[in-house]
């Protein structure tokens, strides 16, 4: 398997039968026999990457798109048209939940590649084994767990001209007797993004991470302890060509994830019971959010003439998560492999906010200032039972069936606020609210492997996303607007169908899937019209008020393919996604949902093997068709685009322990923006990296 500097190869093609994955079965199995569409970014691809963001390593996987919410340092991913809030993020199979998530954004990818062994991406809502949020899919970051000698490691440094930024990382791992370990750390400092129109302000960011793994093996027993931390500082890019704002800033000076996890596995090797797995973790996500908006608008009144409105908000929130999972693996008669388990998870969120709003007229007739403080406490608990059975009921035939039962409970335990206006103090206290739900979701897959080098599959799966605490109970402010939670929200649901084929023969590597999904009760933000949920507020030209509600239905049709031919000196490859998506509300039905109908990558690779060096080169085009969106009442259009790129990796040394990676991106200096990124893409840029394996 050959990887390239921009994460082309191993994640966009079928790996061989030796590639093991764990996400689809909660136990190690080869990728070839996976019951779902899954693709893997291996460690070599991660080492060869010169991307500044780990999200960019996923962008060429069919069905995956990048979104940024105007935050250059917090890129997220969408899968099969579903927003990042509907993509489940796992680290070693443990959820990274985010109760502050809205309808179009999630927690992000708060991990650094220095800790990673590989990344597994499952397309579709196969959440039976892992839980809610996976209508779009699952991204499981698998960390390194040790080595086969006393000490080995990787040192990596990358310079990127697009941001004039550096990234450095180191990871050391090894084993001593029955113990194994891994220590890793990274630091990244990226400047403002360089585009064909110059560098963009407010697109710089920094992040750093540290991690430790300690393991102990004794006979059939394996114990593990993981500690990791990731910290990010970034801010929002905005365009104001008309000078509408006197001041505008949205900053996240701190977004930090800290986690402690414990793991235990044992091989029972009984008549039926074969393995037992236990894991538990505590995770904290802290965020600081600062927002300032100042505008002046003319008013046709001689007593006012012009009105200046100035808003400032500072929010600190902290989410504390505790979770535990117990799982058993049985080998039953008649070729049945059964996984059963139970899971408990609790998220607790504390949020405190301070704000200032002032209104001043040019004449001085209006001069009003209001200061506010608020404090919220809320929590969500989930209990679930799950089971999945693989039954090989005939030669070449395997039937996988899974089920998961949820019991969820959310409640607002405290909601206090105080405001000061012209010496008058007003106190508010929200009533304690609660919401609960119980749901059973299922999945099934039928696989046939009776043809040489060919695996066929048909699958059905249900998706389920329960509203976050922010969507249910909290009042949030950003960009001069206020959004109210709604305790009457229902969970989002989806039914999904898929036909797929994998082929590995005659120098061809092909993975393809046709998929269809129907989703309902999508949660979206609506304009306030004076209703109770909005505290009687109404949206206007001077004040923006929104609230969450279930309004949308969606249908999605798609075709994914990744193919590579290795029978020539130059290996052609292609990966892409064809998608059509339809939204439907009580007042609207449209297929213009902002999705490019076609996007993907096509290229040629070449490997030159010499005495003391291997040179792997890759020239490719990355492209997407135009995208139109009129689902929000206003029409937006994103033109289609295509970029020409070149990457080369050079391995040298007695054991190929040194590696130089060079990527020349956007060679024609194309001016463009992707469909789901609000920040314009970088122009022509070069990135160079050095890797030392020891």
Give a label for each model feature.
Residues 338-452, 575:
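Signature of Gram-negative outer-membrane beta-barrel scaffolds
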Residues 464, 515-521, 525, 622-630, ...:
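C-terminal beta-signal and adjacent terminal beta-strands/loops
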Residues 242, 246-269, 374, 378-380, ...:
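Outer-membrane beta-barrel signature, preferentially recognizing the C-terminal barrel domain
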Residues 190, 196-197, 203-205, 222-275, ...:
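Flexible loop and strand-edge segments within Gram-negative outer membrane beta-barrel domains
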Residues 157-163, 176-178, 187-191, 218-220, ...:
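Transmembrane beta-strands of outer-membrane beta-barrel pores
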Residues 159-189, 199-237, 252-269, 332-333, ...:
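Transmembrane beta-barrel wall of Gram-negative outer-membrane proteins
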Residues 392-399, 407-408, 507-511, 515-519, ...:
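Gram-negative outer-membrane beta-barrel transporters
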Residues 4-149, 164, 464, 499, ...:
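Acidic, small-polar-rich N-terminal luminal/periplasmic segments of exported/outer-membrane proteins
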